[in-house]
Amino acid sequence: MDTSPITARSLQKPYHIKADEFERAYKDFLSGYRTWKELSHAEDWLVFYKNIGPQLSIDETALSDGELYTIISNKAAHGGKGAIVAIIKGTKVEDVVKALMRILWYERAKVLEVTMDFSESMHSIVKQCFPYATITIDRFHVQKDCYDAMQQVRIR
């Protein structure tokens, strides 16, 4: 059994089908995408409350066209299945807090540590949504700031 992913285009020639029509049929009927209960808000936020754990990380990233997204992930998953706790469009504190408040209070209270950068907005989000969590600044940003400070001292 082949375990590598395939595209509709790769099926076009051997099965004599039109790839565009097959893709559309898959999305509209076979995949359940149109009846997905998260579809109405998926463009703005997705929250996977079952993935929450005692150690989380929060960061912002640009996925496409410069659009920023806030991503909260469970560190215990090490980037694998169950890592994403939430993906929220934008970095505005109000929007992110509103999405994270959909996670029940007792689930959010289980979070003991959140790793983040020096961002004030991220700090505010963590304080509002995970009141019992200790904030840890990630090593990359600490090292970068130390290096930058050393460079400034060296240049003077």
Model-based region annotation:
Residues 7-28:
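Short, basic interhelical loop/turn and adjoining N-cap
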Residues 1-6:
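Short, amphipathic alpha-helical "recognition" segments used to contact nucleic acids or chromatin
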Residues 23-128, 132:
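RNase H-like nuclease fold core
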Residues 117-120, 126-156:
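Conserved beta-strand -> loop -> alpha-helix junction used to position metal-binding or nucleic-acid-contacting
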